Amino acid sequence: MIQLEEGKKAPITQRGDYAVVAITKHGVEIARNLGRIFQQSDVYYMSKFEKGDEQEQNIQMFSGSVRMLLPSLFESYKGLIIIISLGAVVRMIAPILKDKKTDPAVVVIDDKGENVISVLSGHIGGANELTREVAAALRAHPVITTASDVQKTIPVDLFGKRFGWVWESAENVTPVSASVVNEEEIAVVQESGEKSWWHYEHPVPANIKTYSSIQTALEASPHAALVVTHRDLKKEEEAILENGVLYRPKVLAIGMGCNRGTSAAEIETVIEKTLAELQFSMKSVKALCTIELKKDEEGLLEVASKYGWEFVYYSPQELNSISIQQPSDTVFKYTGAYGVSEPAAMLYSGADTLELVKKKSGNVTISVALIPYD
């Protein structure tokens, strides 16, 4: 049991991604039910409601004010599901709030389990989606108040998140969000990435126009813009970002061959310099691809892990199934494949051509492909 003491960190045991907290008889029943439904959740409730099976169910009980439990939960979990009145929760979490980019999702449920309310980190932290899931599980009413959700328009801070898109900078997210929900003229410029970003059943709102180039969008003089591209903007295009957000879709496949024992530092430097020459963003890399012989190459594995890229390798037979511009008998002699970087990038991306066919630099050979999306 957790003994809560003023000024001391609560000694919790985290197993899942979400914490479910209750302090009333009815709340405990709801919490236990959610613990059974959501396997990635840890249940916490007051020891006075002990049932006898808590250890078996991995339920953690506590004594003392729940207020002293929340700081530990806040820094440990992706989301908190709290079965306490909204007002009480607001008062308890106010002193421990830090930043919308790092605070966990907070969802509140009333004592009868009739309403599930998204309280904190609705978009970035995922509280809105968590609210919908919990409400569906309890057959309760989801309460979501963020303007873009209510109006069913583009949530600027979540745009493309399900595809892995990332912002170049968060500086203009708030003003651009205001332009979207205030129904001002919005330009969506998409040069690469998944096209299925609109997921509502109704059409895209009339104030949102799509463009295939930044120049065309600039000529339309929108109030704000969402720009989706893997490349660096030219100087004359940068005006689009005065009230705009630049998104980096995950669309680049790096094909790579290297000598055994090549350092991660050398591999990383080659990738950085190559993409800079192409005027492509590192943030748009999705995968690092190579031959099966290199599946345990420490330098490749380290770089892929550092950036969170997929690490993919192919057999010589798979690589030889791709027609390449520069087949090498020497490479075939040592690997069984006529090329590594070129066919690996093409296999992963599904592209018919390469943005960079092949470049040799020191111990590394690199090719770059752009993943096409129709």
Curated annotation (Swiss-Prot):
Pathway: Cofactor biosynthesis; adenosylcobalamin biosynthesis; cob(II)yrinate a,c-diamide from sirohydrochlorin (anaerobic route): step 5/10. It catalyses: Co-precorrin-5A + H2O = Co-precorrin-5B + acetaldehyde + H(+). Pfam families: CbiG_C, CbiG_mid, CbiG_N. The keyword Transmembrane does not apply. InterPro entries: CbiG_hydrolase (IPR052553), CbiG_mid (IPR021745), CbiG_N (IPR021744), CobE/GbiG_C (IPR002750), CobE/GbiG_C_sf (IPR036518), GbiG_N_sf (IPR038029). GO terms for biological process: cobalamin biosynthetic process. Its EC number is 3.7.1.12. The keyword Phosphoprotein does not apply. Keywords: Cobalamin biosynthesis, Hydrolase. GO terms for molecular function: cobalt-precorrin-5A acetaldehyde-lyase activity. Belongs to the CbiG family. This is Cobalt-precorrin-5A hydrolase. It comes from Priestia megaterium (Bacillus megaterium). The lineage of its organism: Bacteria, Bacillati, Bacillota, Bacilli, Bacillales.
